[in-house]
Amino acid sequence: MLHMNSLWGCFLFVLLAVTGAVQGLQEDYSEYAVYRFTSDNYSTLVRDVIAPLTDDYDVWTRSNNFIDIKLPKEIGEQINDGQVIIDNMNELIQNTLPTSQMMAREQAVFENDYDFFFNEYRDLDTIYMWLDLLERSFPSLVAVEHLGRTFEGRELKALHISGNKPESNPEKKTIVITGGIHAREWISVSTVCWALYQLLNRYGSSKKETKYLDDLDFLVIPVFNPDGYAYTWSHDRLWRKNRQRTHVPQCLGIDIDHSFGFQWEKAHTHACSEEYSGETPFEAWEASAWYKYINETKGDYKIYGYIDMHSYSQEILYPYAYSCDALPRDLENLLELSYGLSKAIRSKSGRNYDVISACKDRGSDIFPGLGAGSALDFMYHHRAHWAFQLKLRDTGNHGFLLPPENIKPVGKETYAALKYFCDFLLDPEI
């Protein structure tokens, strides 16, 4: 315990030293608001109503019943059907960033609360230091995997978590968990970190977690988009894509979740679009690095389950995203598992997570291409027998700017779903 306290004490010292240093002058969104349109017709609303007025729009989320879009206020006021749901964007942005008061509070609670890491959102350097600390704290359970480098030269890190060496049980099923594919979805990053910490911290003291790590392998990537995530801290809290160059010099970034090489489509949008898929499959460096890694290690990991964390809208999405005409294999069991995940969350926190086909969520049934090249479809079709995307809290009051006091509640409810998922993979008859 002394060794553990020493490690965490050093981590806190570094954390307090660097927190705030990575925060830059944020993009000003005082002239923008988020509008909710009660329409399920994406094509009519965006292509026929909004696009003729401006190309400065950003679709935050879409569902069967509504579409949330960030617009300049002067444009939003010209569209009668929209209801303002977020008007104070700069204030909400600041509320997601750590403060000096928070740092003082963390120093005070450290001795009695190792969960202090989850009191606030954390920048990329801090998260990477924390992953390295976990490897040192749990050397028999954790190995940091280096998947490759991003366009800006940052490492793409994963944690391999297992209670015993793969050669002792070569048939162990592997669960892959990813977060932060879209840079601004900070709650997805914190939620993945919460899950991996619970698995490690409870090993040996909880029968369930001990069984999970002894009988399953986990590959966990908390920040799938390191460049974009770092940029949300230093420049623009609402940045979505990665940061690589495109064929249009003034337009940086590819949407990683449109870059995977299953049912990929060449971009129909301008390179400046938030959903720009690039000019070739796997053009996004992060998607390419992951593809190369899982091919090189396919003899080491038998990937059986995949959970991709996103925000927002409180939904559990199942394949396929690219088309509503393509039926997934084993649909009945896939739906049963989806509703089981939703029930586990509801039992834990009372929150309702709707179960929806990813194609409906993406709007692929209305405008083909919106769900092309997704990580969900790629992993489901090529690697994982079971694959889901979880869109976390909330349902629109804060959108991507969920206050940090939600980190632990979201972590707890989502971890309940992960435990259900693990139980299912170990015993499909539950």
Curated annotation (Swiss-Prot):
InterPro entries: Peptidase_M14. Zn(2+) binds at H182, E185, H310. Residues 1-24 form the signal peptide. CDD domains: M14_CP_A-B_like. Substrate binds at H182, A183, R184, E185, R240, D257, H258, S311, Y312. PROSITE patterns: CARBOXYPEPT_ZN_1 (PS00132), CARBOXYPEPT_ZN_2 (PS00133), PEPTIDASE_M14 (PS52035). The keyword Glycoprotein applies. This is Inactive metallocarboxypeptidase ECM14. Present with 468 molecules/cell in log phase SD medium. One of its GO terms (cellular component) is extracellular space. One of its GO terms (molecular function) is zinc ion binding. Disulfide bonds join C251-C272.
